Amino acid sequence: DIQIPGIKKPTHRDIIIPNWNPNVRTQPWQRFGGNKS
């Protein structure tokens, strides 16, 4: 499991979204980056 302070663990939905949308090339850690202060 991925444990990152201040961020919830990636859910099944977080993982599957980039898979069905070929236009989404953003990596998980980059997507979560907007939530960091």
Curated annotation (Swiss-Prot):
Tissue: Hemolymph.
Annotated compartments: Secreted
GO BP terms, alphabetized: defense response to fungus; defense response to Gram-positive bacterium; innate immune response; killing of cells of another organism
Region of interest (Disordered), residue spans: 1-37
Entry superkingdom: Eukaryota
GO CC aspect terms: extracellular space
Expression induction: By bacterial infection.
Compositionally skewed regions (Polar residues) per UniProt: 20-29
UniProt keyword terms in alphabetical order: Antibiotic, Antimicrobial, Fungicide, Immunity, Innate immunity, Secreted
Biological function: Antimicrobial protein. Has antibacterial activity against the Gram-positive bacterium M.luteus (MIC=55.0 uM). Lacks antibacterial activity against the Gram-positive bacteria B.circulans, and L.monocytogenes, and the Gram-negative bacteria E.coli D31 and E.coli ATCC 25922. Has antifungal activity against P.pastoris (MIC=16.5 uM), Z.marxianus (MIC=16.5 uM), S.pombe (MIC=11.0 uM), and C.wickerhami (MIC=16.5 uM), but lacks antifungal activity against A.niger and C.albidus.
Annotated protein name in UniProt: Proline-rich antimicrobial peptide 1
Lineage: Eukaryota, Metazoa, Ecdysozoa, Arthropoda, Hexapoda
